[in-house]
Amino acid sequence: MQLEIINPESTLINDVVAHRIAFSIGSNFNIYWYGIIFVCGFLLAILTYSLRLKFHYKVPYDPGFYYIFLAIPMTIIGARLWSLAIGDAKDFFDFRNGGLAIQGGVIAGVLSAAIYFPLILRMPKYHVRDLDADGNVIIRQPSMWIYADAIIPTILIGQALGRWGNFINGEIFGAESTVNDLQWLKKAMPAVFEGMKHYFIEGDKTLFTIYQPLFLYESFFNVIVFVFIYFGLSYIKQLKIGFVSMSYFFFYGVIRFSTESARAPQFSFAGTYVINSLLLIFGVLGALYVQFIAPILRKRFLLDAIIELFYKKKQQAHKFGQLRNPEEFLYYCHK
């Protein structure tokens, strides 16, 4: 008896995956739905945080827009490097056909932002007018944490949409299941139900194995957490600036822990739980820092504290009419 492709090594074989190419340019250049969905996730996240900066925090959204040109290449490179680190042997530059690990993209994006925003926000044109306790108009430099609170949670939008790209590619499926266990999926989302099948040939018969829609679970949890963070935590006045962005790392770690046990064996690797633990720890420590330690440090970012070591003169707030060099002041605003 001949047995072929019973257990998928990386992707499923079904009708959904067979149509993963959206269109072709010429005869050799294919554009995949994965890439289109990936770009849509980026654009939706950009639109969301730009509106947030403009209407909620009332600070210039230009720095966030210009950050796109740094974030996109850094995120893609970081995601690809991370994918290689966990064992993806595809061609490094084959971005259109999957092979992007979101953890690497997040790390690369956050590190680049930690360098970019403290530098660009020192430019006087991005400073904002505010009132001091006496009603005098002063100039303040927006905090990097404002942009972090606006931008970092929108990563969840990209992650939620990106999982649907994985679905069309036949990737990120859960453990083996049965048709009876997934009757709810067949009724609610017939196309997804069909997309979770893996067809194989046994002798002269075509059979299939069906898997849990892990991508759907992660996508759903990402949306729920985003709504909770962006439209719940953001409006709790007792929470300090930066808490919202740090909560992303905590909750994303929780999501990964909760879905890891349902992951198919070929998508698990030794460092998974270590990485998830680091996400949780970083989120908790970061939240504690911005909520309790940062106020003691007068809400000044670490880079500013280091710079101040070289300046003995104490910074003072000036009335707007007396202000000459707004870039020299390290004040922050958070509305």
From Swiss-Prot:
Alphabetized UniProt keyword annotations: Cell membrane, Membrane, Transferase, Transmembrane, Transmembrane helix
Transmembrane segments: 31-51, 67-87, 100-120, 213-233, 235-255, 277-297
Subcellular localization(s) per the UniProt record: Cell membrane
Any Gene Ontology biological process: lipoprotein biosynthetic process
Top-rank taxon: Bacteria
Gene Ontology MF annotations: phosphatidylglycerol-prolipoprotein diacylglyceryl transferase activity
Pathway: Protein modification; lipoprotein biosynthesis (diacylglyceryl transfer)
InterPro entries reported for this sequence: Lgt
Main location per the UniProt record: membrane
Major enzyme class: transferase
EC number: 2.5.1.145
Membrane topology reported for the UniProt record: Multi-pass membrane protein
Binding site for a 1,2-diacyl-sn-glycero-3-phospho-(1'-sn-glycerol): R163
A GO CC term attached to the entry: plasma membrane
Family of this protein: Belongs to the Lgt family.
Function according to Swiss-Prot or TrEMBL: Catalyzes the transfer of the diacylglyceryl group from phosphatidylglycerol to the sulfhydryl group of the N-terminal cysteine of a prolipoprotein, the first step in the formation of mature lipoproteins.
Name recorded for this polypeptide: Phosphatidylglycerol--prolipoprotein diacylglyceryl transferase
Organism expressing this protein natively: Ureaplasma urealyticum serovar 10 (strain ATCC 33699 / Western)
